[in-house]
């Protein structure tokens, strides 16, 4: 069933434009609060956010919704998404909320929901919430003497800082490392530099002056040029780029080269396999991860299990099949020994541990495999279902037959934007470029005709 509000990572859209309005945010609070208002205990919700201008508006709306449903609201302020997931569990809350649009520009915002176990909600639970949103919610309001209380909670940043520090192996210190970190003017602008400094590193920070409108603006994991310049300028050993809510990370090595999530997963998998920490004899990634990663793992007797795009689906597969490492090429790295969702800072600490233990440079540690040529392009759509068109389906089948075992083809609608994503990879770069361009042309022609 097609969902009206929830995409692959919660509800997301332009702020003050449906569905990302304060009215809907309040209704989500009432609906979600109703579903998680089970048992006779006093029910609680934690609400965090990143640094977007619209975050204050949506935070107030969600507090109103949850308290109207009878839940006490613990307001955390700007804090990373993985911290919200952690605090949902440690504060014994019934539900957790992160108000963020992750790596998107400040004009957008979103709502991510976590269950009492700290994991993102399942499709079924999101469907229940959507079903309630279509109904009259007045019947779900708490009685006057059961309305929830709201309060801002102090000290939660320190809890997350200590949690992150504990994920670095005890035999490792960051002393002697000069680290440049880009906090994307986002949720981790205070906690991430503090963690690195307290672990002994010399820290140079950029992207730590949020003003409500500069989150992810020419900074962070989706725009690492500023970090590359800073690494060169200060001669840093490593650069760490987080995104707006700090659930993803990209590394810059000492030469200024980008290290993506696939390479980071390879480093962690190999390191954890050597220390016998790795479970499942492999890792979980999505269909977008490079074929080179799959070959790298296979050569070392490890498996790569693939899921649909979205870190929540990676996590679901990890839980079902007892893996403890998973992630996405974009830098969502999930380490279930330490958390229930992607955590850019914790993932970076595992890379730093590998660097310190080996005594090698970041470029030597993080270049684990040669990626096969991969090309990803997007086609913007305004409606219709071009992937159901006969011409498009034939073009896809022809391309898959041509690639055969020498490459892969992934074509899918974006779960967060009105786009069709076309990705192909294989050993022959010219062939890949031709296939992608032909498919883009076919999809565009169908879209135009529609």
Curated annotation (Swiss-Prot):
SUPFAM superfamilies: Phosphoglucomutase, C-terminal domain (SSF55957), Phosphoglucomutase, first 3 domains (SSF53738). GO terms for cellular component: cytosol. The modification Phosphoserine is found at residue 102. Keywords: Isomerase, Magnesium, Metal-binding, Phosphoprotein. Its EC number is 5.4.2.10. GO terms for biological process: carbohydrate metabolic process; peptidoglycan biosynthetic process; UDP-N-acetylglucosamine biosynthetic process. The active site is at residue 102. Mg(2+) binds at residues 102, 243, 245, 247. Activated by phosphorylation. It holds the Pfam family PGM_PMM_III. GO terms for molecular function: magnesium ion binding; phosphoglucosamine mutase activity; phosphomannomutase activity. It catalyses: alpha-D-glucosamine 1-phosphate = D-glucosamine 6-phosphate. Its cofactor is Mg(2+). Belongs to the phosphohexose mutase family. Catalyzes the conversion of glucosamine-6-phosphate to glucosamine-1-phosphate. This is Phosphoglucosamine mutase. It comes from Rhizobium leguminosarum bv. trifolii (strain WSM2304). The gene is glmM.
